[in-house]
């Protein structure tokens, strides 16, 4: 495999973080945690192609980030050719499933 083919084989990910008043400090995403997440992604062989933050009073029970922000992430996924979304907050199984279905990529 050539170096160019290796680069193309990397997972392209959009990173998503939520900062909500109702979450604890450990559960909230911030610049530092998003940088750490990008570093972990790179260590795992992926590449960050975009980052999205959402500020809300509380996580959306269905999508975690809200319908409007999910639409924004979907648009970014398409524009950047991402094949996955990595969320810096814990998701419930149903939130992960709904986001994956709405975004059309692995979450």
Which residues fall in each region the model found?
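N-terminal accessory targeting/assembly segments
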Residues: 1-107
């Amino acid at each position: 495999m050539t170096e160019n083919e290796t680069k193309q084989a990397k997972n392209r990910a959009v990173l998503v973080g939520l900062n909500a008043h109702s979450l604890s400090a450990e559960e909230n995403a911030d610049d530092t945690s998003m940088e750490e997440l990008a570093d972990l992604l790179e260590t795992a062989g992926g590449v960050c192609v975009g980052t999205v933050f959402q500020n809300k009073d509380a996580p959306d029970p269905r999508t975690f980030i809200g319908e409007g922000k999910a639409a924004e992430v979907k648009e970014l996924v398409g524009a950047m050719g991402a094949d996955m979304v990595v969320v810096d907050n814990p998701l419930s199984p149903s939130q992960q499933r709904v986001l994956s279905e709405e975004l059309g990529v692995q979450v």
